[in-house]
Amino acid sequence: MLTLKILVYTTVIFFVSLFIFGFLSSDPSRNPNRRDLE
């Protein structure tokens, strides 16, 4: 049961970090004129 919880937490952290990295890397290229987030 503990290994299942570790696997779930690892998957969630992986997808969250992948989403954050993809959002930060693609946001300036999609919106070059938007500087209000900085």
From Swiss-Prot:
Regions crossing the membrane: 6-26
Source domain of life is Eukaryota
The answer on whether this UniProt entry bears the keyword Chloroplast reads yes
Example of a GO biological process term: photosynthesis
Could you tell me the membrane topology recorded for this protein?
Single-pass membrane protein
Q: Which InterPro entries match?
A: PSII_PsbI (IPR003686), PSII_PsbI_sf (IPR037271)
One Pfam short name:
PsbI
Spell out the subcellular localization from the entry.
Answer: Plastid, Chloroplast thylakoid membrane
- Per the record, the major location class is plastid
Which keywords does the record carry? Chloroplast, Membrane, Photosynthesis, Photosystem II, Plastid, Reaction center, Thylakoid, Transmembrane, Transmembrane helix
List the GO cellular component terms. Answer: chloroplast thylakoid membrane; photosystem II reaction center
How it assembles, according to the record, is:
PSII is composed of 1 copy each of membrane proteins PsbA, PsbB, PsbC, PsbD, PsbE, PsbF, PsbH, PsbI, PsbJ, PsbK, PsbL, PsbM, PsbT, PsbX, PsbY, PsbZ, Psb30/Ycf12, at least 3 peripheral proteins of the oxygen-evolving complex and a large number of cofactors. It forms dimeric complexes.
Give the family, as the similarity comment puts it: Belongs to the PsbI family.
Q: What this chain does, per the record?
A: One of the components of the core complex of photosystem II (PSII), required for its stability and/or assembly. PSII is a light-driven water:plastoquinone oxidoreductase that uses light energy to abstract electrons from H(2)O, generating O(2) and a proton gradient subsequently used for ATP formation. It consists of a core antenna complex that captures photons, and an electron transfer chain that converts photonic excitation into a charge separation.
Q: What is this protein called?
A: Photosystem II reaction center protein I
Organism lineage reads as: Eukaryota, Sar, Stramenopiles, Ochrophyta, Bacillariophyta
| Name of the encoding gene | psbI
